[in-house]
Amino acid sequence: TDLIGIRVFFLYREDWIHFHQYITNRFENKPELYIKNRLEDFDEDITHYYIAEKPKVYKRAGDTKIYDKNEIEIIADGIYRSLHYIIKYKGYYVEIQGRTLFEEGWSEIDHDIVYPYNTDDEMLKDFSTLLNRLSGMADEMSSYFRRMKGERERF
């Protein structure tokens, strides 16, 4: 039902909060505006810009706990990682996704090789799961390097 999709990438997973604040500072975010049915609840007003669904994060078990449950709906997915926002903008629903470069890399490879045609191929699913774990570790390591750099600069 969304006609426009935007992906935003960041280097470090903990930078999600800056992305989240950017979205919530520019678009009205009130639970009473959240839609239940995108077609039945459609708002014809093209001047009213708002967040149309509670923001969501899809995260994997073992991910660091950096998300605030009050600000964003946390969905524990076995593998997929991404932030999702549905915005009502100029009469259209716009989906905005945010993820790290490593998450995007895994997602594109998985989508190209496994989904939607080879979802029953156990070997491909195993390789996709392994690549997902490696991308998660790469995210953790990049964040660790960033913290190390900050510590070194303090001294």
Language-model features: where?
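Intrinsically disordered, low-complexity acidic/polar and Pro/Ser/Thr-rich regulatory regions
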Residues: 148-155
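Long beta-strand-rich cores associated with HINT superfamily self-processing modules
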Residues: 5, 9-145
